[in-house]
Amino acid sequence: ECATADAINFMAKYGRGLICLALTRQRIEALGLAMMERRNESRHETAFTVSIEAREGVTTGISAHDRAHTIKTAIDPKFNERDITTPGHIFPLVGRDGGTLVRAGHTEAVIDIARAAGYDNPAGVICEIMNDDGRMARLPDLMTFAKDHNLKIASIADLIAWRRRNESLVQRMVETTLTTRIGGSWRMMIYANTVSN
């Protein structure tokens, strides 16, 4: 919803990295997207799908407007696999169920943030930031970048700590009464860990 042409242009101009769209596994399945590689051997196990484009409403697909339109189409639940084509100029990533509590990655972090912000269809656009010399920006560089562009900055560790403080990590699955021969009735509840695989 917030992926405007201006925001995408900012990422392309100042971020300089690959612009990716982090989506939940459920949304990836609804769009019928195949994984880029079945046997993911990348160092961080980033789960890329095939690249995408909106089927309608784009020209070349690469402009900030076209990429923002593709992102909005991919996120909006009223659209499905018939509204997306491949290949394209947006690179979807599959977030793991359980988010940063299962995998402490950028993909999961942006989905966790969107979910915490109350979005019904949590997703987010990410772009790694390159310095002027072509090297990837590290924390001191990112702190300066955030200050220069009036952006907020937080770590994945901060997000994980926030989730542990503010979310219930268990869910009641079953509640029943258990009557025994030796001691009357007991109220029995079974809980499940919501972040285990």
Annotated model-derived regions:
Residues 1-197:
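Catalytic domains of riboflavin
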